[in-house]
A protein has these predicted regions:
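Core catalytic alpha/beta fold that binds nucleotide/phospho-ligands
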Residues: 1-120
């Protein structure tokens, strides 16, 4: 069996706010982490990069064809996502890690589960 693998790392920064309208769908929810929404925006962008890398498709519009399902941002976790560009309409389980300087997202299989934050 063939595994789909994608990974993306995005440096922390405010520039993501300026381009959010190009990749955020109206039905995607932004959640705050440590009192700001930058982390959520970065995770959405990075996750969509991962999805694109795992798709065998061209002309993918990140806003129209890729959707991140609602999740609560934690230091690390996973969340479901879907693509609407291909005939297969793949579902993804995006895993992520927050670091003070960057976010990292990856996907190895097409599993579908729920995000749960670790509680201290």
């Amino acid at each position: 069996p063939r595994s789909e693998v994608g990974i993306d790392i995005e440096q922390y920064g405010q520039r993501v706010h300026k381009v959010a309208h190009k990749y955020m769908r109206p039905d995607e929810l932004i959640s705050e982490y440590q009192g700001e929404d930058t982390w959520s925006l970065l995770l959405h962008w990075s996750a969509k990069e991962v999805m694109f890398k795992c798709m065998d498709a061209s002309e993918v519009d990140f806003r129209e064809h890729l959707r991140i399902m609602p999740f609560q941002v934690c230091e690390h976790g996973e969340f479901p996502a879907e693509e609407y560009r291909t005939e297969h309409k793949k579902k993804f389980m995006i895993r992520y890690l927050l670091h003070p300087d960057f976010v990292m997202t990856w996907q190895v299989t097409s599993a579908y589960s729920v995000n749960e934050c670790d509680t201290p």
